[in-house]
Amino acid sequence: TARAGTPLAELEAALAEQNQCLPFEPPHLRSGTTVGGMVAAGLSGPARASVGAVRDYMLGVSIINGRGEPLTFGGQVMKNVAGYDVSRLMAGSWGQLGVITDVSLKVLPMAPAEATLAFECGQAEALERLHAWGGQPLPLNASCWVEDGGAARLYVRLRGAVAAVEAACRSMGGERQTRASVPADWQDCREQRLPWFAQRAPQQALWRLSLPQTAPVLALPPGVAAPLVEWHGALRWVQAGAEHASALHALARAAGGSASLFVATSEDAASAEAPSDALSPALAKIH
């Protein structure tokens, strides 16, 4: 259990000392991120598609409602079935349901083994590979397809038991990444510090497309670069100006998903016809 104002970095450091972690890898995005902000924003990192989201690790929460009344929901242990499951509703609520004062979270031990494999392939082939692997008993943890410097690569992170990770490396192929910077690269993916994010032009917004994992490659408007693909195909980041807002919304809806304006200048936000689409009930369980 942590107070809402506890710095997220401080909590993660304390957990790491005990070989524990928050498996959903909440992004910080800037210094000073707090536990309460993490829950209110409801954002998850690269491992989201494999391990679950913030709400899946919520055990209990205390809030102050609109009448100034202190309320507590849930508990501090897994076996907790009393009352309404308001704790999970707080994840991604952006403070609309109350001011969070403290949070109880489920944590897990760090994986005993980890490996990252790289594959040179286009987006369509990357999605095909991810769909095929998803139907196999492989310790998939995170994935990222990115086109950088003219080269398109799919990176897949494996986590789990030593034997499972080693067996997956042998069966999946690809090039095993042995650089000391690999863990930092995944952190850069989580924190949007990869070169792909840095190349965004000042007049471009960063769009977050939430799609079914089985969605095909999207035919983006002319002049819009290939997306960065995470969550085994379910999350696609797109850099585009406000003039492409309508097209992105239409593409996402046609694929059974939604588009949200994630990072933009005030001018972009004002000119975009709608910052975000409502998620379908099925997608709301994933994103």
Which functions belong to the PLM regions below?
Residues 1, 152-154, 235-236:
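Hydrophobic residues embedded in beta-strands of well-ordered beta-sheets
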Residues 1-30, 39, 43-76, 111-119:
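N-terminal glycine-rich flavin-associated loop
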Residues 3, 53, 78, 118-122, ...:
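Catalytic cores of large soluble enzymes that bind and process phosphate-bearing ligands
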Residues 5, 156, 238:
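Residue-level signal for inorganic ion chemistry
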Residues 10, 124-129, 163-170, 214-223, ...:
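Short, conserved charged micro-motifs
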Residues 16, 105-106, 132-135, 171-173, ...:
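Short, solvent-exposed amphipathic alpha-helical segments in soluble enzyme
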Residues 30, 177-287:
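Conserved glycine-rich FAD pyrophosphate-binding loop
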Residues 40, 59-203:
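C-terminal substrate-binding/cap subdomain adjacent to the FAD-binding core in PCMH-type
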